[in-house]
Amino acid sequence: MTMITDSLAVVLQRRDWENPGVTQLNRLAAHPPFASWRNSEEARTDRPSQQLRSLNGEWRFAWFPAPEAVPESWLECDLPDADTVVVPSNWQMHGYDAPIYTNVTYPITVNPPFVPAENPTGCYSLTFNIDESWLQEGQTRIIFDGVNSAFHLWCNGRWVGYGQDSRLPSEFDLSAFLHAGENRLAVMVLRWSDGSYLEDQDMWRMSGIFRDVSLLHKPTTQISDFQVTTRFNDDFSRAVLEAEVQMYGELRDELRVTVSLWQGETQVASGTAPFGGEIIDERGGYADRVTLRLNVENPELWSAEIPNLYRAVVELHTADGTLIEAEACDVGFREVRIENGLLLLNGKPLLIRGVNRHEHHPLHGQVMDEQTMVQDILLMKQNNFNAVRCSHYPNHPLWYTLCDRYGLYVVDEANIETHGMVPMNRLTDDPRWLPAMSERVTRMVQRDRNHPSVIIWSLGNESGHGANHDALYRWIKSVDPSRPVQYEGGGADTTATDIICPMYARVDEDQPFPAVPKWSIKKWLSLPGEMRPLILCEYAHAMGNSLGGFAKYWQAFRQYPRLQGGFVWDWVDQSLIKYDENGNPWSAYGGDFGDTPNDRQFCMNGLVFADRTPHPALTEAKHQQQFFQFRLSGRTIEVTSEYLFRHSDNEFLHWMVALDGKPLASGEVPLDVGPQGKQLIELPELPQPESAGQLWLTVRVVQPNATAWSEAGHISAWQQWRLAENLSVTLPSASHAIPQLTTSGTDFCIELGNKRWQFNRQSGFLSQMWIGDEKQLLTPLRDQFTRAPLDNDIGVSEATRIDPNAWVERWKAAGHYQAEAALLQCTADTLADAVLITTAHAWQHQGKTLFISRKTYRIDGHGEMVINVDVAVASDTPHPARIGLTCQLAQVSERVNWLGLGPQENYPDRLTAACFDRWDLPLSDMYTPYVFPSENGLRCGTRELNYGPHQWRGDFQFNISRYSQQQLMETSHRHLLHAEEGTWLNIDGFHMGIGGDDSWSPSVSAEFQLSAGRYHYQLVWCQK
């Protein structure tokens, strides 16, 4: 044990937090989570242990701008002005200091290992009583599961130890410091340490005791470590559970270890042995270790699909059977290996349906509770995710247990990122930083190695490639050869990774960056001598309105076996709740706390909002990742299961044929499909519809029974096919009414019954409509070629740094947002049964014509206005965001009804999950409340739209809401939006894709750009 004086002054003088060679003082060795049961039955059933006591709750807290400002007296007693805070928590969420959001740039001046003298310091204290029996015998430990960034610990005024690495436990022996009665803990937490240089992850930078604190009482002679490994014969019919147990304390001949394996109430196997390890070398073996091997016939294998778990109980006892203590863990029998270029689980090649997940809560910062963790897992499972990457640090210990039990594959990642270093490997190639890096990797492995859900270790994130990585890769492969290791840094295919694991590599497009080219994922597979599997550690950057082009990745994954999926970036928006002057909550992002530097809204890349409400993009991910695929041939549906281990024992296939959303026929068939099997379903002869319209066949896989992660009736997969269109024609009834045209010096006015249309002859726009005496328009109907920029349109542009290649900057530079209409033509003609208005506009900026729009409006005796639009795009202007029409309707109706793709928001390159049907939603649901306002709410493939008294027909896309594109463009946060008068309607003949391969470079695929030069579309606008 390291002994230093208890004096605060001496601790401050040592400055351990600026010494990369000091990562801990007196911290105990890492190990799996312990509970030290004194009853093996309680260990088997995982009941709360009487030897494990939580210290979570209210602690006294005082904040100081620097550690030197902390008074020495604090070690002995609480300060008179100390506050009370809840532990675990981040002190920034209690109003102390400010959270800082930055992606790459370090929040402190880069001068490793030194940190600013103004180093915010939180002083925590807690008084507690200790059970006298704990003082009489054994060892009492204190466990801090997570403290950011570094801390010193005192107990009863005496210095205990020091720890850093904010994402792994720091555990200390308190036995020598405790006494009967009241005891006092004092914890000095520093915001910045040399460890901060290894924790440059894309997240909020927060501080404090943010994970659980507990006391653990162990016997003097104790189990100090145990690890379990499962091994198999070739066909997985026989397995061996290998348990290596290590003890600490007096090594006596009478000591025995028993390992028993349980499946529920049934004991499957058991073995007992004295200590004394196998021979290691010419000097012998470990006297304090023993390895037991239990044979298991026909084990029920663990997978994310069927997370079968056993329970291993490890007992330390004397020869006469007296139990000293027991530890336990869940065991999943599974094998992970790479063979012939494929990542295999239990002999089957995996397809990773993964997502990156930060630990984030909108109210509690980086504090995770069980309810939130379970909510995340349920949502992931419900949306067809089978894997999660712990980006970019080891998670709360409970997370892994939940993943074991619910079934998720886990990439466990070391808390190492040096993204802001120049070059990135400045520290990771420096031997002085090897001890700090080593602790972060080795302690992660030692804590989490017993979890079957952990199938891959990761050496960290975005830290270049250094010699330290190579050393740690070799250490893991030596200590735990049962799992592959991945690491993206230095080009994603270095010697420190078993898996090619690039981030944001595109399907077909190479990105030849200097030193570390990023090949297309298809090309990577074909590089000479390359036989590793490729799994994208990050792809499909889901920032705001994004995930366009997701389907092309999944087409490639299914086409090329060695493309084994990837992890979407990322799961949850990292917005935080703030309150305005009236106490109303709003969602904040980088810079909203006065934090500098900051990367604004780049913290919001989630498939779900911070409160776990899904983004529309989540449905696209669910659909592309679904485990059932469908093919239609005639009246036969072929259903293929992509499950590797599950039989479809809880699925029905529901099918329906509908004409323009009206059901014509339907049925339900139980699915009986084995793993990777097929089933053919023959549909009956379908009735012939009597009217014209689009005929669609929809199939849905429905789970009739609830599961551990879903309710009864859950839809897990679906597909639609458009059948041959019914071409029967219903002729319109003859009309004897003829619209009347009146011409004045300023307007053309057309009147038919109680309806009137007014076209302004100076502007050439439809300026007003009336139904009776009620005006229908607040603004004229006019062309629209722009959208409120998406995050993907903005890229890395900001006020102080313009990226001229970003779509929004190209549109601005070309004048798309500033373009004004110059009238070229506005004429009116009376036809035999209609009035025809013809207009032409040149949309110009600074004398240059960008678009020419020609329209005809034909108003007939039924009151239908047929609008034909022809648009020519200048050859030297950027491809526009949209080609359509916009106006502000006077009405505000509660409901929106449409026949088209829905129900969720969809865009041309993100619509495979949308279904063609007749949908009816509240107006409020037509708007997607992205925290950073942007273009949103589009519905594609629309044939008919009904709103208030109006109906539009054609083949178009639309969005409709209380917010104009202008307001969305000019507003920084959604809570600042105000509902405008009336309703804004945007009807597009064509709309550009949204992209999403990444959010910092143009990523809309060419086929989803509006590059044709000439466009035509038609609408019918009438009143019901």
UniProtKB/Swiss-Prot annotation:
Keywords: Glycosidase, Hydrolase, Magnesium, Metal-binding, Sodium. It is an enzyme of class 3 (hydrolase). InterPro entries: B-gal_small/dom_5, Bact_Beta-galactosidase, Beta-gal/glucu_dom_sf, Gal_mutarotase_sf_dom, Galactose-bd-like_sf, GH-type_carb-bd, Glyco_hydro_2, Glyco_hydro_2_AS. Substrate binds at N103, D202, E462, E538, Y539, A540, H541, N605, W1000. Binds 2 magnesium ions per monomer. The record marks H358, H392 as: Transition state stabilizer. Mg(2+) 1 binds at E417, H419, E462. Its cofactor is Mg(2+); Na(+). Mg(2+) 2 binds at N598. GO terms for molecular function: beta-galactosidase activity; carbohydrate binding; magnesium ion binding. GO terms for cellular component: beta-galactosidase complex. GO terms for biological process: lactose catabolic process. Gene3D superfamilies: 2.70.98.10, Galactose-binding domain-like, Glycosidases, Immunoglobulins. The active site is at E462 (proton donor), E538 (nucleophile). Its EC number is 3.2.1.23. Belongs to the glycosyl hydrolase 2 family. PANTHER family: BETA-GALACTOSIDASE (PTHR46323:SF2). HAMAP family: Beta_gal (MF_01687). This is Beta-galactosidase.
